[in-house]
């Protein structure tokens, strides 16, 4: 198949391009900076055509889709603070543009990369694809929720949109040290605050392989979870320390203490005070209210098994 990937110079997107190429697909990357495509893909040992454009621009999106069969939409604006601005433009407007143009040009499938944050924070013992969506705690979360509702509208209309909600993504060869890596770097450089609860860890290579396997036409609208392996925060620290070959400094805290500290850091940032620890009140709430995800249907349908967290962390810090 001929597949367009948005966000192909990002972490998930670049690995998805590599997985698609390994599966024998012809890949085009829609990028605002097309000169970055070859540079980002080089460490992964693959090449792809680059098309200049922005997911918020209908004309460049339509031009990139011409002559192609399917699209995997991984482009997103990540952030948990500040005004909605670019988050709305990319996460909502960009998603609407991609879906609209893909439907108009009869692409099949249209694969959308969602996030389990749409379900968080949650008091449920386990999150499933049918779990209730959470009330957003930040402009970023609000934009992802709005995008998710938009995707579900397209699915309800019968369009061949496959959505896959992924968890905390880690692994090797990240073009940009952001997102999950902020927590890793902060924990390794200073100290890890360890609250009750846990988190999901999914390897970027497993995520990419799943997205590549989802690029199958004729399946109609589908929704999947790919949160990954669940670990407690205590296990997270232990596994990361083993991967780094060091005993990590840690301090156990209660959920209330963690949330209060996140709120204090938010207040300091508003006052222009630089805070080295990548913790916000929203992040603290989610850290203490993130249940496991039931990915069994996803793994069974796509005949996939997740790498161990030890392997993922080992390759992350390498």
Indicate where each model-derived feature is located.
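A conserved pocket-lining segment of Rossmann-fold NAD(P)-dependent short-chain dehydrogenase/reductase
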Residues: 183-202, 206, 210-213
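Active-site helix of classical SDR
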Residues: 143
């Amino acid at each position: 198949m001929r597949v367009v990937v948005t966000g192909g110079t990002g972490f998930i997107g670049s690995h998805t391009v590599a997985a698609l190429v390994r599966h024998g697909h012809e890949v085009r990357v829609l990028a605002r900076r097309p000169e970055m495509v070859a540079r980002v893909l080089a460490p992964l040992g693959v090449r792809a055509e680059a098309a200049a454009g922005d997911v918020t621009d209908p004309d460049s999106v339509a031009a990139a889709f011409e002559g192609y069969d399917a699209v995997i939409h991984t482009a997103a604006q990540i952030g948990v603070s500040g005004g909605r601005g670019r988050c709305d433009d990319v996460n909502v407007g960009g998603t609407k543009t991609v879906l609209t143009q893909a439907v108009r040009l009869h692409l099949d499938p249209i694969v959308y990369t969602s996030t389990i944050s749409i379900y968080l924070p949650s008091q449920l013992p386990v999150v499933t694809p049918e779990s209730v969506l959470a009330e957003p705690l930040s402009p970023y979360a609000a934009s992802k929720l709005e995008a998710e509702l938009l995707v579900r509208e397209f699915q309800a209309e019968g369009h061949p949109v496959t959505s896959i909600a992924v968890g905390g993504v880690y692994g090797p060869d990240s073009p940009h040290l952001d997102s999950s890596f902020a927590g890793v770097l902060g924990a390794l450089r200073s100290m890890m605050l360890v609250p009750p609860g846990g988190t999901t860890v999914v390897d970027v290579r497993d995520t990419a392989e799943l997205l590549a396997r989802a690029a199958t036409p004729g399946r109609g609208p589908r929704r999947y979870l790919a949160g990954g392996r669940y670990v407690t925060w205590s296990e997270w620290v232990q596994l990361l320390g083993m991967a780094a070959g060091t005993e990590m400094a840690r301090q156990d805290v209660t959920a209330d203490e963690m949330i209060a500290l996140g709120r204090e850091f938010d207040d300091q940032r508003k006052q222009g005070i630089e805070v080295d620890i990548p913790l916000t009140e929203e992040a603290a709430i989610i850290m203490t209210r993130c249940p496991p995800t039931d990915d069994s249907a996803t793994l069974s349908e796509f005949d996939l098994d997740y790498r161990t967290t030890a392997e993922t962390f080992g390759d992350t810090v390498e």
